[in-house]
Design a protein with these regions (language model features):
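Extracellular/luminal low-complexity Ser/Thr/Pro-rich, glycosylation-prone repeat/linker regions
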Residues: 19, 65-126, 166-172, 176, ...
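Surface-exposed coil/turn segments at beta-strand junctions on protein surfaces, enriched
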Residues: 29, 48-52, 69-73, 105-107, ...
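...the same signal can extend to comparable exposed beta-sheet modules
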Residues: 1-2, 7-24, 29-49, 54-60, ...
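Short, acidic/polar linear motifs in exposed loop/turn regions
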Residues: 1, 14, 63-65, 145-150, ...
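Intrinsic-disorder/low-complexity, polar/charged segments enriched in Ser/Thr/Lys/Arg/Asp/Glu/Gln
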Residues: 5, 33, 52-56, 99-101, ...
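Low-complexity, intrinsically disordered segments enriched in Ser/Thr together with acidic residues
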Residues: 38-75, 83-88, 142-144, 190-239
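Short beta-strand elements of extracellular/lumenal beta-sandwich folds
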Residues: 1-7, 123-158
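A surface/secretory-pathway sequence property marking extracellular, secreted
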Residues: 2-42, 115-119, 153-197, 254-267
Length: 269
C-alpha cells in the first residue's frame, strides 16, 4: 500500500480550534482539519503487508466553567477518513478508502462548597467563643451548589453530624428541602434540579442550617469536627452520567468568618 493519507475533521460546540496540537500532522485551521500524508509522516508513503501504526493529536475542549463562556450541552466529534493506493499484480493502482467517526458528550461540572460561620448568615448564634466544655455554642453551616454546562437532575447533599453535635431545626431559605434524621445523625438536602451556568448568578443554590456543639471535658484543647465529609450527587441530564462532588469535614475552626480570631476554635475548659 502506498501514498497513505489521513484526514481528521474536528467539530462540536466544545471544539476550541486554538488548542489543537496536530503532532506530525498539518493542521488546516480554516477547515478544522488535520492532515497526515507521506510528507508529514514518512511511514505513510509505503505500508507493507501486516504493518500497523498510530498517529497522535490532542486538543482541549472550550472553557465552559462560567456564564461568560457558555456552551450548552458541550460535545465533540472527530471524523477520520483514510485514503491510500494498492498496487495490483499488474502494477495498476487501486484506490482504497475507509472512515470512522467518534462523538463525545462532555459532562457538566457539579460543585459543592461547605463552610461554617458565626457572625454571618440568617441566624443569631449564641454561646461562648472559643467553645467551652459542657457548654453549648451554636454555629451556622452554609452549603453551596454550583453547576456549569448541562442541567443536573436529582441533586442531593448528605453529611453526618457527630454525637456531640445537635440539630437546632433552624434552616434557610424557606422552600429548600433539608431534613435531619435523629436516628442516623444524617443531614440531607434534596436539591433537585440544578440549572446550567449557576456560578455567580441568582441560580446558585444555597442553604443554611444551624447546629449546636456541646464538647466534653475530653475535648479540651481540641478542634472538634462538627460536620463530617459532605457529598453531593446528581445526574447530568445531557450525558446521563452520575456526578459527584465532595467537601471536607467542618470543624470549630470557622476562619472564613470575618469575626474569627486565632484561638477561637480550640475547646476551652
Amino acid at each position: 500500500i502506498i501514498d497513505g493519507e489521513i484526514h481528521a475533521k474536528l467539530s462540536g460546540t466544545a471544539y476550541d480550534k486554538i488548542s489543537v496540537a496536530p503532532g506530525e500532522g498539518y493542521y488546516k485551521s480554516a477547515d478544522n482539519e488535520i492532515v497526515w500524508n507521506k510528507i508529514t509522516t514518512s511511514s505513510l508513503g509505503n505500508i507493507g503487508p501486516g504493518e500497523s501504526g498510530s498517529i497522535n493529536f490532542s486538543f482541549t475542549p472550550r472553557d465552559f466553567s462560567t456564564p461568560l463562556k457558555p456552551v450548552s450541552n458541550p460535545n465533540l466529534s472527530v471524523n477520520v477518513d483514510v485514503q491510500a493506493k494498492r498496487l495490483s499484480e499488474s502494477n495498476v493502482p487501486e484506490n482504497l478508502a475507509s472512515s470512522a467517526k467518534r462523538s463525545m458528550k462532555i459532562s457538566s461540572r457539579l460543585s459543592l462548597s461547605s463552610s461554617v460561620v458565626r457572625s454571618q448568615g440568617p441566624f443569631t448564634n449564641t454561646g461562648s467563643i472559643p467553645p467551652r466544655a459542657e457548654k453549648q455554642t451554636t454555629y451556622t453551616v452554609m452549603w453551596t451548589v454550583n453547576n456549569t454546562a448541562n442541567t443536573v437532575t436529582g441533586a442531593e447533599v448528605r453529611a453526618l453530624l457527630p454525637a456531640y453535635v445537635k440539630w437546632t431545626a433552624k434552616t434557610s431559605p424557606v422552600g429548600e428541602d433539608i431534613s435531619y434524621n435523629s436516628n442516623t445523625g444524617e443531614v440531607v438536602w434534596r436539591v433537585g434540579n440544578v440549572s446550567a451556568y449557576t456560578v455567580n448568578t441568582s441560580q446558585t443554590r444555597l442553604v443554611f442550617f444551624q447546629i449546636a456543639i456541646e464538647p466534653s471535658v475530653a475535648q479540651v484543647g481540641q478542634v472538634p469536627v462538627m460536620v463530617q465529609d459532605t457529598t453531593l450527587v446528581g445526574r447530568d441530564d445531557f450525558t446521563g452520567e452520575n456526578l459527584t462532588s465532595t467537601a471536607p469535614a467542618l470543624t470549630t475552626h470557622f476562619s472564613t468568618d470575618p469575626s474569627y480570631k486565632e484561638g477561637n476554635a480550640t475547646v476551652a475548659p
